[in-house]
Design a protein with these regions (language model features):
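Short, basic (Lys/Arg/His-rich) helix/loop patches that form interaction surfaces
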Residues: 255-309, 313-316
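Active-site/catalytic core of tyrosine-dependent DNA strand-transfer enzymes
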Residues: 209-278
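Basic, Lys/Arg- and aromatic-enriched nucleic-acid-binding interface segment
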Residues: 134-168
Length: 374
C-alpha cells in the first residue's frame, strides 16, 4: 500500500485553506472533511486524484456500507455514511475546477458519490431522542453529594445547564462575569464564549424552579468568597490533578483554567446519571427538555417566540423541527385529552378559558373604538 502521495497532499492542503478562508468552516468541520477524504484515499491506495474514475466512487460507497464503527462494532449509520460521501463529493466538485484537474474530472462524475435514495431517507429520518424529564433532573441533582468543591461544581454544572439551556461547549468557556444573578441574565460573548456559529447572544434564566437557581447562585458565591475567583475566571473551572496522601495522582481541587472542550462536561453528566440509577442523558438533551416545558407553559405565539430566542434560535421553526417533537407517551395523553374535551363541549361550544380571552379582547377593542368616536 502506498504510504504517501505528495501531489495529493499539496492539493488537499490547498482545499483545507479554501474551506477555512472561503467557506469559513470551523476546525471541527475541516477535520471531518479531512477524515472522509483520507478514507477515500485508503480505498484507492492513495492514487492520484487526477486519475479519478466513477468506479472508485462506487467502490468507496460499497466499502462504507461494509465497514464497522470501531467504537460500537456495528455498521456505520446511514447518516454517517451520507456525511462522508458528501464531504468527498464536495472535495471533487472543487477539484474539478482546479488547474491540472479540469480536463480530468467532470462535475457530473462527482454525482456518483450520491447516497442511494432509500439510504438518504433513512439518514434524514427524525428519530425520537431520549429526553430527561424535569423530575429526573431534580432526582439527579438531589443525588449528587455537595461536600467537596468538585462535587459542588458538578452539581452546579447540571443545574446551570437546565437553567440556561446553553450548549455544553459554550458553558465550558463561560466566565463568572458573564452571569448576572440580579437580572437573571447571561451574556454569551462570542469573543470568548464558544457559542454555535460564534453568535453573541443575551439570554435569561428559564423558569425551572427557585431551587435550581439557588444551586447556581450558591456556586457563584462559593467561587467568589471561598476561592476568591474574579469575573474573568471560568464559571466551571477544570479539575486540578495532583498527588494524594498515597502519592497517587488524583483530583485535588480546581484550577483557574477553562475546559478545552465539552468532553469533561459529558463525563460529569454520565457519572451523575449513572450514580442516580438513571440512563445517561447528554447535556444537549436538556435543551429538548426545556423545549417541551416551553410548549406546555407558553400560551401565545409571542411567548413561544421569546422562549425560542432564549434558546439562541433565530427562527421558531428551528425550535419546533429540531427540539419540539412531542414524545410518544405525551402524544397519546394529548390526543386522549383532546378527545375528552371535544366530548365535553357539544356543538363546538368553546371552553371557559377561550371565552374569557375573547371577552377580554372585545372589551379592549370597545374602549379603543369609544376613544375614537369622542
Amino acid at each position: 500500500m502506498t504510504k504517501h502521495n505528495a501531489k495529493n497532499e499539496r492539493i488537499k492542503r490547498k482545499y483545507y485553506i479554501y474551506l477555512k478562508e472561503a467557506k469559513r468552516l470551523s476546525e471541527k468541520s475541516i477535520d471531518n472533511a479531512a477524515t472522509a477524504i483520507a478514507a477515500f484515499e485508503q480505498s484507492t491506495n492513495k492514487r492520484d486524484f487526477a486519475g479519478f474514475h466513477i468506479e472508485q466512487a462506487k467502490k468507496f460507497k460499497r466499502e462504507l456500507n461494509e465497514v464497522n464503527n470501531p467504537k460500537t462494532g456495528k455498521p456505520l449509520a446511514k447518516a454517517t455514511i451520507r456525511t462522508r460521501l458528501n464531504d468527498v463529493k464536495a472535495f471533487f466538485h472543487w477539484l474539478a475546477g482546479q488547474a491540472g484537474y479540469k480536463s480530468k474530472i467532470s462535475y457530473s462524475d462527482c454525482e456518483y458519490f450520491n447516497q442511494p435514495a432509500n439510504d438518504t431517507r433513512i439518514a434524514m429520518a427524525i428519530r425520537e431522542k431520549p429526553v430527561p424529564s424535569i423530575e429526573q433532573i431534580h432526582h439527579v441533582l438531589s443525588s449528587i453529594p455537595s461536600e467537596t468543591i468538585i462535587e459542588k461544581r458538578d452539581r452546579a454544572l447540571l443545574a446551570f445547564t437546565l437553567l440556561s439551556g446553553m450548549r455544553d461547549d459554550a458553558i465550558a468557556s463561560l466566565n463568572i462575569g458573564h452571569v448576572d444573578l440580579d437580572k437573571r441574565r447571561i451574556f454569551q460573548d462570542a469573543n470568548t464564549v464558544r457559542t454555535k456559529f460564534r453568535k453573541t447572544h443575551n439570554s435569561t434564566f428559564f423558569p425551572v424552579g427557585d431551587d435550581i437557581e439557588a444551586i447556581v447562585s450558591e456556586w457563584i458565591d462559593t467561587l467568589k468568597t471561598e476561592l476568591l475567583y474574579s469575573d474573568g475566571d471560568p464559571l466551571f473551572p477544570k479539575t486540578k490533578i495532583g498527588l494524594d496522601e498515597n502519592d497517587q495522582f488524583a483530583a485535588t481541587g480546581l484550577t483557574r483554567d477553562h475546559w478545552a472542550n465539552a468532553q469533561p462536561i459529558r463525563d460529569i453528566f454520565k457519572n451523575a446519571f449513572e450514580a442516580a440509577n438513571l440512563p445517561y442523558y447528554n447535556p444537549h438533551s436538556f435543551r429538548d427538555t426545556l423545549t417541551g416545558l416551553g410548549l406546555r407553559l407558553c400560551r401565545t405565539p409571542e411567548e413561544f417566540k421569546a422562549w425560542s430566542q432564549n434558546s439562541s434560535h433565530e427562527k421558531v421553526m428551528t425550535t419546533f423541527m429540531n427540539y419540539g417533537k412531542v414524545e410518544g407517551h405525551r402524544q397519546a395523553e394529548i390526543m386522549e385529552t383532546v378527545g375528552k374535551q371535544g366530548a365535553a363541549r357539544p356543538d363546538n361550544e368553546p371552553d371557559a378559558q377561550t371565552i374569557a380571552v375573547v371577552l377580554q379582547h372585545l372589551t379592549k377593542q370597545a374602549k379603543v373604538d369609544e376613544k375614537g368616536t369622542v
